[in-house]
Design a protein with these regions (language model features):
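Short glycine/proline/serine/threonine-rich loop/turn segments at secondary-structure transition edges
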Residues: 45-53, 113, 154-162
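Solvent-exposed serine/threonine-rich low-complexity stretches and specific carbohydrate-binding patches
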Residues: 21-33, 130-141
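Short, solvent-exposed loop/linker segments at the N-terminal edge
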Residues: 92-98
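Aromatic sugar-binding surface patches on proteins
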Residues: 31-41, 140-150
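Extracellular acidic, Ser/Thr/Pro-rich low-complexity tracts
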Residues: 1-3, 15, 60-62, 104-111, ...
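Terminal edge beta-strands and adjacent linker/stalk segments
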Residues: 65-78, 173-179
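Proline-centered linker/hinge motifs at extracellular inter-domain junctions
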Residues: 82-83
């Protein structure tokens, strides 16, 4: 019969709600070191999330065919999680009832920074995480960063404060806390 490298292999995939396709597959090649056919699946950032099916068909030089062999839910396309890329306070010291601006840079493979949202919290040396002294966060399109004002009350505890933030993308994936 035919040597493996002479077979014609067809590989297709199917997302949870579409038809069979080859669009996001690389050209197939025969890996002689492992004696198998290989392809790369590279879904775009707009690819549907979920489990994908794969089907394979082998044809030989005599035009005989194996027919389709289908494998269900063998690939899972996941959302890339968002990241906090930077955090910058406008000042590192302030007085009670005065404000400093907190800026945060965020990124995500699928979403623009402006389409995401951030969660900011602070705590004093003896306190719990809170948000009372923070203004509503907003995206500053001029700087390309998220911003909020930190304004401690006249009764705020003196000392150092920790600030932490996370970012949530449009698929509801949330980064780890950045402190």
């Amino acid at each position: 019969e035919d040597t493996e490298s002479l077979h014609t292999i067809t590989v297709e995939y199917r997302s949870p709600s579409s038809d069979w396709s080859t669009t996001d597959l690389s050209t197939l090649w025969h890996n002689s070191a492992t004696s198998r056919w290989e392809t790369n699946f590279t879904p775009p950032t707009t690819a549907e999330l979920g489990e994908y099916d794969i089907r394979i068909q082998v044809d030989d030089t005599d035009e005989d065919s194996s027919g389709w062999s289908t494998y269900s839910d063998v690939l899972e396309v996941l959302n890339n999680g968002p990241l906090v890329t930077s955090y910058t306070p406008s000042e590192t010291e302030l007085y009670r009832t005065t404000s400093i601006r907190l800026q945060a840079g965020v990124s995500d493979t699928e979403d623009s920074a402006s389409s995401m949202s951030i969660t900011l919290q602070y705590r004093s040396e003896s306190g719990d995480w809170a948000t009372d002294y923070l203004s509503t966060s907003y995206f500053n399109s001029s700087s390309g960063r998220w911003e909020s004002n930190f304004t401690p009350a006249s009764t705020a505890e003196l000392g150092d404060y920790d600030i932490r933030l996370s970012v949530t993308d449009t698929d509801s994936s949330t980064s780890t806390w950045y402190t």
